[in-house]
UniProtKB/Swiss-Prot annotation:
PANTHER family: 30S/40S RIBOSOMAL PROTEIN S3, SMALL RIBOSOMAL SUBUNIT PROTEIN US3C. This is Small ribosomal subunit protein uS3. It comes from Mycobacterium leprae (strain TN). InterPro entries: KH_dom, KH_dom-like_a/b, KH_dom_type_2, KH_sf_prok-type, Ribosomal_S3_C_sf, Ribosomal_uS3_bac-typ, Ribosomal_uS3_C, Ribosomal_uS3_CS. Pfam families: KH_2, Ribosomal_S3_C. Belongs to the universal ribosomal protein uS3 family. One of its GO terms (biological process) is translation. The keyword rRNA-binding applies. Residues 38-106 form the KH type-2 domain.
Amino acid sequence: MGQKINPHGFRLGITTGWKSRWYADKQYAEYVKEDVAIRRLLSTGLERAGIADVEIERTRDRVRVDIHTARPGIVIGRRGTEADRIRADLEKLTCKQVQLNILEVKNPESQAQLVAQGVAEQLSNRVAFRRAMRKAIQSAMRQPNVKGIRVQCSGRLGGAEMSRSEFYREGRVPLHTLRADIDYGLHEAKTTFGRIGVKVWIYKGDIVGGKREVTAVAPAGAERARRERPSGTRPRRSGAAGTTVTGTDAGRAVGGEESAATNIGHSDDSVVTHEPQIAES
């Protein structure tokens, strides 16, 4: 199920919240229809603004719309003219007072929706789909909060006669783990061969108890020792397989003589050195 379902809906109420927050008794269907119309209006009129998310809150006589965008200057416009136009269109649509909040996205490379929009824009500009996917993966993996990413393109890739799907993945993307923080984005690229769908999954770590899990860093000494001894190698054993120096009677005898010889010149507290003496005639 985790491979097919939308990650946001799969984790709704567990690690993710609702993007539309309001209560309605008899006007539920009308409010849902208005929310869909608001999101469609913002997505069709502001393609170049890089809108990552739209959150809607309602009260009795007011609608609050939060727009998370990577390019707030395009949404605001010169002297706020574009923001005033958007607010007027929303008030005409909802017939209520609209409070418009424009929020800037700090890391666009770690937002799945913006990554999907970037790949789709490159596909529309006749860039090879494999190159666009790899470039998006490389730029996303440079972000410190990204632990894994998967990018998938579906359609007539490269102008082929038969449509297919291809994806690239780097790092971990646990889609079935409910505590995993998975960001999901979807966008369509309009090309001369038809539409190509782009899906992006970004894994940003686990959420335990409402807080992001902090990965423990290994000590420097242990990491250094691990680098010095390559993996898969064992210390060489003397003698035949299954035998050591003291594994036989002769070996035990030799080992006992060597240990006795080493203990002659050493005491518990000091080391005694024996100098050669010359006999006098």
